[in-house]
Amino acid sequence: MSAAGPAGLPADAGPVLEALEELPGGPELLELARLRDDVALVGGAARDLLLGHGPRELDVVVDSGAADFARELSSLIAATAPRRTARPTVTVHDRFGTAAVDWKAGRVDIAERRSESYRAPGALPDVRGGTVEEDLLRRDFTVNAIAAPLAPALRGTLQAAPHALEDLAAGRLRVLHDHSFLDDPTRLLRLARYGARLGFHAEERTAQLAADALAADALASISRARVGAELRLALAEADAVRALDALGALGVLAALEPWLRFDAELARRGLAILPPDGRPDLLLLAEMLLGATAAEHGERVMFDFLDGLEFTAADRDRVIRTALCAPSLLTDLRAAELPSQMYEALASRTLEAAALAGALGAEEPHQPATDAARRWLQTLRHVRLSINGDDLLAAGVPAGPQIGRRLTEALHRKLDGDLSNGRDAELRAALEARV
C-alpha cells in the first residue's frame, strides 16, 4: 500500500480532512471516528476530495458493525440539525454488511471491510470480512481503491491499492485484476460513466479487457434490472450526453441491442430547446430508441427493452410515446405555418417529443420544424382563454360537444392574433364560431 501521493495530488490526506469538516455529515463522522480506530473515508469520496471536487456522498468503511455505526451517526446528525428538520433515515443491507444514512443535506454510505468472490461470471458476490488491503482490492477501478483513515492514530495518511494514486494523478481508469469485467459486467457501464464524468481514459490493458468482455457477451450474464440501474445513473449524470456517448463508443449500447444507438449532437440539440419542466433523461432515452421505431413491431420492442430495465410504467410509456411520434411530428411541424397549427400539432404530445422533433428538424434549411417546436415550448403552450364552458352556457349555448369546439376556435383565433385582448372578444369569437 502506498502512503503518499504523486505529483499533482496532495502528499497526504490533510486537505481531505479539512474539506470533510465542511461537508454535510463530515463533522459528525470525525466525531465518531475519535472513539474507534477502524473508520476510513474511501472510494469515490476519497477520490473526489483528493481531486479537489465535492463528492456526491460520503463513503465510509469500518471493520464491523456498519448498521450500529449508521444508527449512531444518524443520532449525532439529528442532534446537531436545526429544529423541525426531518430525522435521517437509516437503511441496512445485512447480506453485504452495508448501511446508509440519508437526510435532506446529504448521504453517508457505510460498509464493513470485506473481500468478495464470484461463483460465476455476473453473479452477485459472496462476501466475507476482509482486511484493509482486501477491501481496497475488491473495488472496480484503482482510482476508487483509496482510503483516508479517520482514526486519530492514522489521520492524515493515505492507504491505496497499487497504481491507485498514480492513476488518479494521470486520469487513468484501471481495473484491479483481469477478470474484473467478467465478474461484474456492470463495471463496463461504470467505465464509460466515470470516464465521462471525470474526463479520465481507460488504461490500455483495461480497454482491451473491456473489449474482450463485450465480445464475450459478458452483459448477458447479468440481469437487465442491473443494467437498468446503471443506465439510470448515466442518465442522471451532470453531463448525461457525454456519459451516453461514452457508452456508445465503448460498444455497450450495441451489445445490449443492435438497434440501440446514441447521437450526441442530436441529443444536445433536443436538450437546448427542452424547457425546465421537461425530463432530460426521458428525452435522451427516447433519442436512443429511435432506431427501434423503424423495426417490425417497434413499439413492442421498445416496451420489452424498457420493461426489462425496470423503468417505471409511467416513464416507459412516456418514452415510447416520445420516440414513436417524434419522426411523424417532424412532418406535421414542417407544414405548420400558423401558431394555431403549431399548437394543434403539439398540444397532445409530450414536451420531450416536441423537443426531439425540433432537434430532428435542425438539419433542414431554414429549420421550420425547429422554430415551431421552440415557439410552442416557450410561449404557445401557455396561452389560455379567459372564458370557459360556463360562460358559453350562460350566453345560451346548449350543452354538448359544440362547447369544446367553440372554445377551440376562439383559442385558435387568439393564438393567431385575430382577437383583441379581453374576455368580451374571446366570448364573441366563441359565439361566432362555425361549428
Please provide the spans of the model-predicted regions.
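Catalytic cores of the polymerase beta-like nucleotidyltransferase superfamily
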Residues: M1-V435
